[in-house]
Amino acid sequence: MGLSDGEWQMVLNIWGKVEGDLAGHGQEVLISLFKAHPETLEKFDKFKNLKSEEEMKSSEDLKKHGCTVLTALGTILKKKGQHAAEIQPLAQSHATKHKIPVKYLEFISEVIIQVLKKRYSGDFGADAQGAMSKALELFRNDIAAKYKELGFQG
């Protein structure tokens, strides 16, 4: 299920645009995630009290966490599938400390694609969307495999 060199190039090209505003993109991704899947908000003690989109938009903590999420994801994407060293601590913390189910990683992957589609419609066509989808699936599958090793049934 690996990606071709051309597919990785499409992923990294669009990710270059994301890196121009990691905090803004991250904030939009998290807000979109919480709106589409409100149950995911319960996993974030820091944000559970944010009930409205306006409260979410004005939360510096949410913006900061969005930046952290997309920074970590960018580091993983740049490894072009050779990301075992980066996946291990992420899987460890998400399985044992945060207890984030793989399903929630699917949700955020879908949201990332939707946000990129909305922001970069001209540069994020069907081929680029397909490549990003494959890259995010590879990431999720590798996280899920680590979860299994750790005995987490998420």
From Swiss-Prot:
Its EC number is 1.7.-.-, 1.11.1.-. It is an enzyme of class 1 (oxidoreductase). The keyword Membrane does not apply. SUPFAM superfamilies: Globin-like (SSF46458). O2 binds at residue 65. GO terms for cellular component: cytosol; mitochondrion; sarcoplasm. Keywords: Cytoplasm, Heme, Iron, Metal-binding, Muscle protein, Oxidoreductase, Oxygen transport, Phosphoprotein, Transport. Nitrite binds at residue 65. InterPro entries: Globin, Globin-like_sf, Myoglobin. One of its GO terms (biological process) is response to amphetamine. Residues 2-148 form the Globin domain. Belongs to the globin family. PANTHER family: MYOGLOBIN. This is Myoglobin. It comes from Rattus norvegicus.
